């Protein structure tokens, strides 16, 4: 979630992760962001996008896609909403954009605020989540991360044409004890002991 709301995530955490990626010199890293508009001003997305775009200048990480939290962070089993996020992340389905800030402004002009931003992807960046990829989900609150994590890494939903991928899936906190194969950076039982994240090597990636 791309904001400084501090309820589900914080942009400072993202900036720290981006610095870590540079330290490890990791290739082919893509950012798929969810706009907020609920815990912060409903039209503050442009500011946060600009902040990260500036941060990424000359960096390995590329800003690949945007979608509102209404779709990507549903928690009420509205799978038709989650499907829009899944298809953006996995199949690159959405509206092409050459400039996310301009595209957000266009949405604002149409009365669509950050929470409800429709899926869009950077037209000059061909990035989608594929089998064998590493995924790092940096939200720290658990409730609104479960459904998108479930469809990406846990269970198939044939009715909505969503099936999990074979991913090295990493979360900042433990979203659900029942999830299989998910790596947790800061586990709830003893958060002090989880102060070092072991990243895959270039060979693993």
Language-model-derived ranges and their functions:
Residues 143-190, 194:
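Gly/His-enriched, cation/cofactor- and phosphate-binding structural elements
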Residues 1-4, 30-32, 85, 134-141, ...:
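Beta-strand elements within well-structured catalytic alpha/beta cores of enzymes
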Residues 27-29, 61, 167:
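A structural micro-motif
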Residues 1-20, 24-51:
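Active-site histidine-anchored catalytic micro-motif
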């Amino acid at each position: 979630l791309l904001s400084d709301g501090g309820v589900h995530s914080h942009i400072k955490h993202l900036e720290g992760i981006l610095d870590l990626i540079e330290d490890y010199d990791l290739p082919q890293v893509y950012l798929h962001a969810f706009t907020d508009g609920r815990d912060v001003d409903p039209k503050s997305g442009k500011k946060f996008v600009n902040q990260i775009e500036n941060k990424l200048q000359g960096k390995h990480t590329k800003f690949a896609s945007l979608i509102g939290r209404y779709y990507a962070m549903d928690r009420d089993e509205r799978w038709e909403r989650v499907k829009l996020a899944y298809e953006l992340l996995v199949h690159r389905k959405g509206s092409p954009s050459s400039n996310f800030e301009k595209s957000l402004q266009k949405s604002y002009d149409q009365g669509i605020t950050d929470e409800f931003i429709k899926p869009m992807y950077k037209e000059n960046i061909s990035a989608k989540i594929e089998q064998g990829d590493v995924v790092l989900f940096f939200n720290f609150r658990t409730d609104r991360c479960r459904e998108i994590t479930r469809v990406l890494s846990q269970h198939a939903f044939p009715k909505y044409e969503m099936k999990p991928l074979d991913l090295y899936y990493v979360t900042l906190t433990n979203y659900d004890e029942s999830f299989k194969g998910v790596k947790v950076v800061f586990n709830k039982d003893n958060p002090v002991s989880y102060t070092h994240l072991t990243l895959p090597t270039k060979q693993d990636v």
